[in-house]
Amino acid sequence: CHVKLSPPPGSKAECVIINAVECEPYLTADHRLMLEHPEEILVGLQLIMKAVDVKKGYIGIENNKPDAIALMTEKAKDYEGIEIVPLKVKYPQGGEKQLIDAVIGRQVPAPPAIPINVGAVVQNVGTAYAIYQAVMKNKPLIDRIITVTGKSLQQPSNLLARLGTPFQQLIDECG
């Protein structure tokens, strides 16, 4: 996160893109976070935009999450310079380079090029939420929402888990 928020000399960010594309089947943590904490994510995006001195922010969400798109679009009306971008569901849409191309139509050249070389700073939904928590609530990053899923679980869930929680404890929580 720190590296992305500190562009190299001579580089200038033009926009921030929040990656709300869950690139693996069955992952739903970002989706739940958007439904339960949309304003915190939007404020987190504003804070990132301020940190890199840009006026434009995007949140890319796959179009198989119409409830999140509708809610985030409605809430974003109160936040200047922020646009919600519905995206086609295709793998690997959540890859940083693919996301930049889909949202702002710019292609990141081959390495050693990085997103800032095309004016983009990319963070994910969880990071925007964590930045909100850190700045607005003075809460350090000690936990995060994660998806625990699989055919052998009785109750697949999104759990708020402390960093370092053993996998077995999370599995036991879901049966």
What are these regions (language model features)?
Residues M49, I171-D172:
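Residue-level preference for well-ordered alpha-helical positions
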Residues K55-F167, E173-G175:
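Hydrophobic alpha-helical positions that pack around
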Residues C1-A102:
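Iron-sulfur-cluster electron-transfer modules
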Residues L42, F167-Q168:
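A generic alpha-helix preference that emphasizes hydrophobic side chains
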